[in-house]
Structures are given as structure tokens and as C-alpha cells.
Regions:
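Structural motif corresponding to the early beta-alpha repeats
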Residues: 1-9, 30-33
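Short, conserved acidic/polar surface loops in the N-terminal third of protein domains
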Residues: 5-10, 38-42
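CE4/NodB-like, metal-dependent polysaccharide N-deacetylase domain
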Residues: 8-27, 54-59
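Beta/alpha (TIM)-barrel catalytic core signal, keyed to glycine-rich beta->alpha loops juxtaposed to Asp/Glu
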Residues: 31-171
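Short linear sequence motifs
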Residues: 5, 16-19, 151, 155
Length: 171
């Protein structure tokens, strides 16, 4: 991709036209973590875009500035460490009752991610509360245990309730 300042500014300004708005309530830097800090720096630092977006927030055209995390926990930690100067308003993380402590593959335990956000009082936006739908279709022995406690509740409602329960989750 071309991360030039010109392309990035054009995309930003086109978003206002496409959405037919004068400001964004939440402006998210998407897919931070893939490609390491090299890609983050190319997309937002080297071309001055992060500084530009911070000025846009000051001007009121962005009300809340944040990013979505996908991948490398070292990048998560480094971008989060920028909070002292950037003052991130929110971060989107994968959070569900399986990934809380038992994340697999490229995922990172949500307990760690959320804990780091909480230390800095940064709001969390949740993705994958149903883990791609898998938490709405669990084995029957688990369904039975859930229904013993709350017979009227759907299996999916347990996952949504878990994901929406932490104090700093935006709901």
C-alpha cells in the first residue's frame, strides 16, 4: 500500500464526503499490530498523519481517536506507551470469555490487553464477543450448565454479557 501523506489525507477527507458528516465521533486507526512497528511508523508517524489526526481532534473534527489491535503484542505495548503524548481515547480489542485467558494463534489474552488499557483509563471497544459465532454454538454439556443457572437466557447472551461487563468497555 501507499502510505504517503497525500494518499492518507485524501482518504481522510473522502471519509467526510462519503459519510456526509462534519466530524467523527470515533476515528479508528485500523489493524495496528500486523507488520510490526515498521508498518505503524510508515502509516502514521513518518508521513506525519498521527500529528495531523491529533490536530484534527483538537479542532473537533475527531471527537475520540483510537485504534484496533490485531497481532503482535509488542506493537500493542509500544503503541499503548504513546498514550502519555497521544492520549488515546479508546482501543478496540478482541475480548470474549475464551480469549480472556486462553487465546490461541495470533490472539493475545484479553485479560492482559484490557488490564493494560485499564491501567491508563482507556476505554475498550470490543470485537469478536462471540469468537466468530463459536460461542453461540457450544457443546450440549456446556449449554446444559448455562441453562441450569439462567434457563431463559440464550447461549450467546452469556458471551455478550461477559464482553460487556468490564467497567471500561464502551457500551
Amino acid at each position: 500500500s501507499n502510505f504517503s501523506r497525500e494518499n492518507s489525507l485524501a482518504m481522510y477527507h473522502q471519509s467526510f464526503k462519503d459519510m456526509q458528516v462534519e466530524y467523527f465521533d470515533y476515528y479508528l486507526l485500523h489493524a495496528i499490530g500486523g507488520g510490526g512497528m515498521k508498518v505503524f511508523n510508515e502509516r502514521y508517524i513518518d508521513n506525519g498523519m498521527l500529528d495531523f489526526l491529533l490536530k484534527e481532534r483538537e479542532a473537533g473534527r475527531i471527537r475520540h481517536l483510537g485504534w484496533s489491535f490485531h497481532g503482535d503484542v509488542e506493537v500493542f505495548d509500544q503503541v499503548l506507551a504513546m498514550h502519555d503524548t497521544v492520549k488515546w481515547d479508546f482501543v478496540q480489542i478482541q475480548l470474549n470469555y475464551v480469549d480472556w485467558r486462553h487465546a490461541t494463534g495470533n490472539n493475545v489474552n484479553a485479560e492482559y490487553l484490557y488490564g493494560e488499557l485499564a491501567k491508563r483509563n482507556i476505554a475498550a471497544v470490543i470485537m469478536e464477543p462471540l469468537l466468530g459465532g463459536r460461542l453461540s454454538n457450544v457443546p450440549e454439556h456446556i449449554v446444559g450448565r448455562l441453562k441450569q443457572r439462567r434457563p431463559e437466557d440464550s447461549v450467546a447472551s452469556w458471551a455478550f454479557r461477559f464482553a460487556g461487563s468490564p467497567e471500561l468497555v464502551l457500551t
